[in-house]
Regions:
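Small-residue-enriched hydrophobic alpha-helices in membranes
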Residues: 1-55, 65-239
């Protein structure tokens, strides 16, 4: 049985309750998949992305076809499960609980309990990918994403690194892309670079619960990291 079959069964169970909300969704993920940690992580990532995408759309007030396509780049949903994914999306969008409560619950569900948790950074990265799909991150979307980062305990340097990959602010600052302060010794820069490359290896991404489709998006992340490191290395070599 694929993850989408399991996720479809789960969503059908949650949506059958008339009072379904974030508390029901989170508790169901914890209990239904408690015996399979790997599957639980994959379901948790999918649920967080779907629910927070819905909340972002509600905050922005509009969903464009470009954003729908961007979502489909992260998740290749089988036609048989499209209805169930739409159910979860609707639960989140119609729930009176605000997006901050959703973000807090998703952080508890997906996070490690530490600042700059990689899985939560992946979720934020995915939300940026969707938000920028229509060519512009609107003001409300930007405010939403920054607040999500705060709730996820993603510090400003890591947030700026994610932002720099999605928003064209002119020539990207390579130090911002790597999330490291300018002026640090080259050994620290190289150590940071190697950690980023290791964290973004496909095996690591899958282990964190990311779907196969997300790995294609992560290649853009790795390309930006490589380019930033090469730029710093060249600059220091000619200094």
């Amino acid at each position: 049985m694929s993850i989408w079959d399991r996720l479809g069964d789960f969503i059908a169970r949650v949506s059958s309750s008339a009072s379904s909300g974030v508390a029901d969704v989170v508790e169901a993920v914890r209990t239904v998949f408690s015996g399979d940690p790997d599957l639980r992580r994959r379901v948790a990532f999918s649920v967080a992305m779907i629910a927070l995408s819905a909340k972002m759309a509600k905050a922005d007030g509009i969903v464009t076809q470009d954003e729908v396509r961007a979502f489909q780049e992260i998740f290749e949903v089988p036609p048989s499960e499209t209805r169930n994914v739409a159910r979860l999306y609707d639960i989140a969008q119609q729930d009176v609980a605000g997006f901050e409560i959703y973000a807090q619950r998703m952080a508890q569900l997906c996070g490690s309990g530490h600042a700059n948790c990689m899985m939560l950074e992946d979720i934020l990265d995915g939300l940026f990918h969707i938000a920028k799909a229509d060519g512009l991150i609107h003001e409300r979307e930007g405010q939403f994403l920054h607040r999500i980062a705060e709730i996820f305990r993603i510090d400003e340097a890591h947030y700026e690194a994610i932002l720099s990959r999605h928003v064209n602010l002119g020539a990207a600052d390579p130090y911002v892309v790597l999330g490291i302060e300018r002026g640090k010794p080259f050994e620290e820069i190289r150590k940071r670079y190697r950690k980023l490359i290791s964290d973004n290896h496909p095996d690591r991404l899958i282990a964190r619960g990311l779907p196969q489709e997300f790995i294609k998006i992560a290649t853009t992340r790795v390309a930006a990291i490589n380019a930033a490191y090469e730029m710093i290395e060249r600059g220091l070599r000619h200094a």
